[in-house]
A protein has these predicted regions:
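GNAT-family acyltransferases
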Residues: 1-96, 157-161, 165-166
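Short aromatic/hydrophobic contact patches that present stacked aromatics
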Residues: 3, 98, 131-133
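Conserved acetyl-CoA-binding loop-helix of GNAT-fold acetyltransferases
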Residues: 98-101, 107-121, 142-147
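Conserved G/P- and acidic residue-centered "switch" motifs that form tight phosphate/ATP-binding loops
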Residues: 109, 126, 138
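Conserved beta-strand-loop-alpha-helix junction that forms the acyl-donor binding cleft
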Residues: 132-142
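Conserved catalytic-core motifs of GNAT/GCN5-like acyltransferases
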Residues: 133, 146-164
Length: 166
């Protein structure tokens, strides 16, 4: 059974372990928790929770962003985030939604599921046209985006831009 849970400052060792499994940087997805101590992870949870409630742009670039975890039968298998609006830089790389599945849970359809659920959440906060970018060589993510209604609108030497209209 699938469940998408919003990040909580009370998230525990199961989420910490998931974030240790997800590489620090892979296919344009950055995971700042990989390599942190459990105490540092708990501090990260507080910061990420605050980002969700932020108003406007912070530090000249950080937009409000809500983080979620995909659970399968009670086990966290992936994470994703929704950026509430876009800066010019995020229009080039990043877009509204970023997501990643732990390497040990890939090729099971979980990427498609987390993106489907993140799209629903994005609609719930008022985002009607969703931009998602992916690396040119990230074929798995391209398939996931297309399966969720993504339309390729632009391609550069490094990235593909997709819009999902909800």
């Amino acid at each position: 059974m699938f469940e998408l849970r919003k990040l909580s400052i009370n998230d525990g060792i199961d989420v910490y372990n998931l974030l240790q499994d997800i590489p620090k940087e892979e296919n344009g997805f950055g995971n700042k928790v990989n390599g942190l101590t459990y105490g540092e992870y708990k501090e990260w949870l507080v910061k990420r929770d605050q980002y969700s409630n932020q108003v406007g742009i912070l530090d000249g670039w950080r937009v409000p962003e809500t983080t979620f975890f995909l659970y399968v039968d009670g086990i966290p298998v992936g994470m994703g985030s929704i950026r509430h609006f876009l800066t010019e830089a995020l229009k080039e790389v990043g877009g509204h939604i970023g997501y990643c599945i732990s390497p040990k849970y890939r090729q099971k359809g979980y990427g498609k599921e987390i993106l489907k659920r993140l799209i629903i959440e994005a609609r719930g906060i008022g985002i009607t046209d969703i931009l998602i970018t992916t690396n040119l060589d990230n074929f798995a993510s391209q398939k996931v985006i297309l399966a969720n209604g993504g339309k390729e609108i632009d391609r550069s030497s490094e990235h593909i831009h997709f819009w999902i209209y909800v």
